[in-house]
Regions:
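Glycosyltransferase-associated regions of secretory-pathway enzymes
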Residues: 1-135, 153-328
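Small-residue hinge/turn detector
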Residues: 136-148
Length: 328
């Protein structure tokens, strides 16, 4: 009987020790080893670092306020009211990116706060600010924080972007394209580039200065000039004098013909043949997307079906349709 009592007591003591070890040692192990791993995973998951581990090509798209046709835009995985030109340009851009090394991230009013929680203005077609100013401000924020290549909506990409992305990673800190709209004969002037397409490393001083000036302009002016972004980028370039900086002139952006005359948007929407200065050099054709969307004389083009777009046979529809055909 005595030995039985001792055995029971041993079992009780063993149980108490096991209980202590389970709830204290395991708790210690959890707090020091397991919990930090879970928190780190949650942090990384919420940040979605997997989306920006590679170099990023950024672009933006939104529903125009006038548009009433529905098209399925696979890149955004939802129905969006996007004119066929912008839909096609997005598909073409996607096809020119080597996904092994680079990602395409399409910013929209629905996801902008995920990437830029501190973005200071409403980013949709109902905003009081012009689309051009809003997109320029967006580019300055994205490139300052993440770096990469920002391609404005409605840009036709004619060559793969491997070389540009490689040079941006290993050779240059800043890459610009084309000439400023406001400055005549600026095609070869790297101090006055266009700002429809910009490549930069994150935290680049020139882009940080550009962003700062854009914000100052936003806060100090009741009305924001839609072309002010180009001016402010130029001021920042002149002020910072970037060393590792490369500029592609207008031969690469479809802005000029062989006589060095600017190719107008009306010419692209017309039927008279285009005489590019050097067609083999073309990388992008960047269009003033805000004019295409909101100038009444181009309104007919925004309501074309895919079939009507191809059959329109204008210069712009021929160029875009050819690139789409190469994808499909």
């Amino acid at each position: 009987m005595k030995s039985s009592s001792i055995l029971i007591l041993v079992f009780i003591i063993f149980g108490l020790i096991s209980y202590y070890l389970y709830y204290n040692v395991f708790d210690l192990l959890y707090n020091h080893k397991i919990h930090p791993l879970i928190e780190d995973y949650k942090k990384n998951f919420n940040r979605k670092n997997r989306s920006i581990e590679k170099q990023v090509v950024w672009t933006y798209i939104e529903d125009p306020i006038f548009f009433d046709q529905d098209y399925y835009l696979q890149l955004l995985e939802k129905k969006k009211n996007v004119p066929i030109l912008f839909n096609f340009c997005l598909q073409i851009l996607n096809s020119k990116i080597n996904k092994e090394f680079n990602d395409l991230i399409v910013i929209s009013p629905n996801n902008i706060k995920h990437y830029l929680p501190d973005f200071p203005i409403e980013m949709n077609a109902q905003s009081k600010y012009s689309q051009k100013f809003r997109v320029d401000l967006l580019a300055s924020f994205l490139l300052s924080k993440y770096g990469g290549l920002f391609v404005s909506p409605g840009t036709v990409v004619l060559k793969d972007l491997d070389e540009i992305m490689y040079n941006l990673k290993f050779k240059y800190d800043l890459i610009t394209f084309g000439g400023s709209i406001r400055n005549v004969n600026s095609c070869n002037d790297k101090n006055h580039p266009g700002n429809y397409i910009i490549g930069a490393k994150h935290s680049n001083p020139t882009i940080l200065g550009y962003k700062k000036r854009m914000l100052e302009n936003l806060h100090n002016n009741g009305y924001v000039d839609k072309l002010v972004g180009e001016d402010l980028l130029s001021y920042s370039i002149i002020e910072n004098k970037p060393d590792k900086y490369f500029h592609f002139n207008c031969e690469y952006t479809g802005n000029v013909d062989y006589r060095n005359h600017v190719i107008s948007l009306d010419h692209y929407f017309g039927y008279r043949p285009l005489d590019f200065k050097n067609e083999e050099n073309l990388i992008f054709i960047s269009f003033p997307y805000d004019l295409i969307l909101y100038d009444k004389k181009y309104g007919w083009f925004n309501n074309l079906s895919e079939k009507q777009f191809v059959e329109a046979d204008t210069n712009i529809s021929i160029i875009v349709s050819k690139e789409i055909y190469n994808i499909k």
